Amino acid sequence: MTHILALNGSPRRNGNTETVLNAFLRGAEEAGATCETIRLSSLTFKNCLGCNACHKKGVCVITDALTEVFEKVMACDILVLASPIYSMTVTAEMKGFIDRGQFLWAQKFKTQTLVFDEEHLKNHIGVFLSTSGQGLPIMFDAAFPVVRALFNDAGFSYTENVLFAGMDEHGGVKAWPESVEEALTRGKELVQRVNEP
């Protein structure tokens, strides 16, 4: 059975991002997936120290709430990184999480103990789900390479963007029910594609 881990980087409860994320996961569950959501803002964790200790042994010297989160990341089939756009990129919560993934990069390129073959990448999907207040066509551009870095280091094929721009213009997700419907459909269709023989 396909297992989805969703990391919610929004500091707001029941806002635009959390609402469309919940709809996406509801659609995924309707297609047979199991889902778990972790709100990064509810966790206590330190930011990357930039100490480069992981470059030697491939292990982060910090042990905190993110230690277990990364274990779950490496065990799931689909990883959803959900974040609203703050100052043209992901939130501080999401960026802090991604920065802590430096040890995965170190395992791939320094200690060379982490290798993903084509079969693994085929069966592990990365999804970026995001909302923005403004509707400019460049709203998500700075966030794409940030989330791609984590997906690449953790062994996920980054193939899916679920994006909703112009939330302010629409009056937010509560006044834009089509966004919820689209998110639900996207979640359902993704799991159906993954489960195709």
Language-model segments: which ranges?
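Cofactor-binding loop segments of dinucleotide-utilizing enzymes, especially the Rossmann-like FAD-
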Residues: 9, 40, 131-133
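N-terminal beta1-alpha1 ligand-phosphate binding loop
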Residues: 2-31
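Glycine-rich phosphate/pyrophosphate-binding loop and the adjoining helix
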Residues: 30-31, 138, 144-197
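N-terminal beta-loop-helix "entrance" segment that forms/cooperates
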Residues: 40-59, 168-176
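Short histidine/acidic/glycine/proline-rich micro-motifs that form metal-
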Residues: 11-14, 85, 133-137, 168-170
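A short beta-strand-loop structural module common to alpha/beta enzyme folds
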Residues: 33-43, 162
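Helix-loop-strand module that forms the ligand-binding subsite of alpha/beta enzymes
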Residues: 61-152
